[in-house]
From Swiss-Prot:
PROSITE patterns: MANNITOL_DHGENASE (PS00974). One of its GO terms (biological process) is mannitol catabolic process. It catalyses: D-mannitol 1-phosphate + NAD(+) = beta-D-fructose 6-phosphate + NADH + H(+). This is Mannitol-1-phosphate 5-dehydrogenase.
Length: 382
């Protein structure tokens, strides 16, 4: 089996690329970073530090790389069995024209073997969004052929990959946590389902998308916001602070109650999942900075994201939410000189006051009880 993976950054190499290579798939990375491309093509291998209770070093080998803006990537799309991405949500639109050209070439060459495309991004139904961009870039006479022969498969991904702190200055070395989860929507594949050991197939992807968003992402963000307010440097430092830990665990239990109501998750299994997430935040090898995890507070306070969406669920099912409120208040306090959204948030609160600002960012009713609760909590933190 041959695969092309867009994005040779830390997540591409340390997560999806590694899982594909470990499965014995012939893997080519596509990227714009010439230093990384040259290193991959010189060595055809790289090292991944996998850290948890212990640390081990795995070598990923037999890999190649091409520029994501040249003809090589178009040629590969015409030939491979699988295309994956880890480029970040904003970049999906930029790689769509190259994918479209490759699909046209595939059609022209008469290659009717199924191709499946999986965007592995930290977003909901990212592949469906990528499909929209690809379809817009396709000529009309290719669209029906693509619908017939190409599967656009949504996925949910979870692995903490902190920014590289390589002591060797090796552009390819990467550190990842032991935990990884790659769940894909098996209803969207064309042809036979692939046999990739680390890929989990489901016919209810949204349950797992929301489980991750409401637990890992919610907990990570609240740990960062409360940790920064308390003067902690890393996620580990913050989660070892008993006061912060109690709020983070409480918030994940509140959002978990929504998931259990909505999707029928087993309560004991979900409690164990929460404990596993807390353990991941404690990982001493992941020097994950609270400022990095907290950045983009406007996005994280928006209606469909990790703080407001679970809160809306608690309102829908009349469930408690006092810890989620603490997290939202903490997010409103987030300040960072390096983050434009943090500066915009501060300006908005200074201009409109916390009540109107939160309502504008989150879509919540300014006169609602929850906004009032969040503003009270926000003021109590000053």
């Amino acid at each position: 089996m041959k695969a092309l993976h867009f994005g040779a950054g830390n997540i591409g190499r340390g997560f999806i690329g590694k899982l594909l290579a470990d499965a014995g798939i012939q893997l080519t990375f596509a990227d714009v970073n010439q230093v990384v491309l040259d290193a991959l093509n010189a060595r055809h291998s790289y090292q991944v530090h996998v850290v948890g209770e212990t640390e081990q070093v795995d070598t990923v080998s037999g890999v190649n790389a091409v520029s994501s803006i040249g003809d090589d990537v178009v040629d590969l799309i015409a030939q491979v069995d699988l295309v994956t991405t880890a480029v970040g949500p904003v970049v999906l639109e930029r790689i769509a024209p190259a994918i479209a050209k490759g699909l046209v070439k595939r059609k022209e060459q008469g290659n009717e073997s199924p191709l499946n495309i999986i965007a592995c991004e930290n977003m909901v139904r990212g592949t469906t969004q990528l499909k929209g961009h690809v379809m817009n870039a396709l000529p009309e006479d290719a669209k029906a052929w693509v619908e017939e022969h190409v599967g656009f498969v949504d996925s949910a991904v979870d692995r903490i990959v902190p920014p590289s702190a390589s002591a060797t200055n090796d552009p390819l070395e990467v550190t990842v946590e032991t935990f990884s989860e790659w769940i894909v929507d098996k209803t969207q594949f064309k042809g036979a389902l692939p046999n990739i050991p680390s890929m989990e197939l489901t016919d209810n992807l949204m349950a797992f998308v929301e489980r991750k968003l409401f637990t890992l992402n919610t907990g990570h963000a609240i740990t960062a916001y409360l940790g920064k307010l308390a003067g902690h440097q890393t996620i580990r430092d913050a989660i070892l602070d008993e006061k912060i830990r109690a709020v983070v665990k409480g918030a994940m239990e509140e959002s978990g109650a929504v998931l259990i109501k909505r999707y029928g998750f087993d309560a004991d299994k979900h409690a164990a999942y929460i404990q596993k997430i807390l353990g991941r935040f404690e990982n001493p090898y992941l020097k994950d900075d609270v400022e990095r995890v907290g950045r983009q507070p406007l996005r994280k306070l928006s209606a469909g994201d990790r703080l407001i969406k679970p809160l809306l669920g608690t309102l829908e099912y009349s469930l408690p939410h006092k810890n989620l409120i603490q997290g939202i208040a903490g997010a409103m306090h987030f300040r960072s000189e390096d983050d434009p959204q943090a500066q915009e948030l501060a300006a908005l609160i200074a201009d409109k006051g916390p009540q109107a600002a939160l309502a504008q960012i989150s879509g919540l009713d300014a006169n609602s009880e929850v906004v009032s609760e969040a503003v009270t909590a926000y003021k109590a933190m000053q």
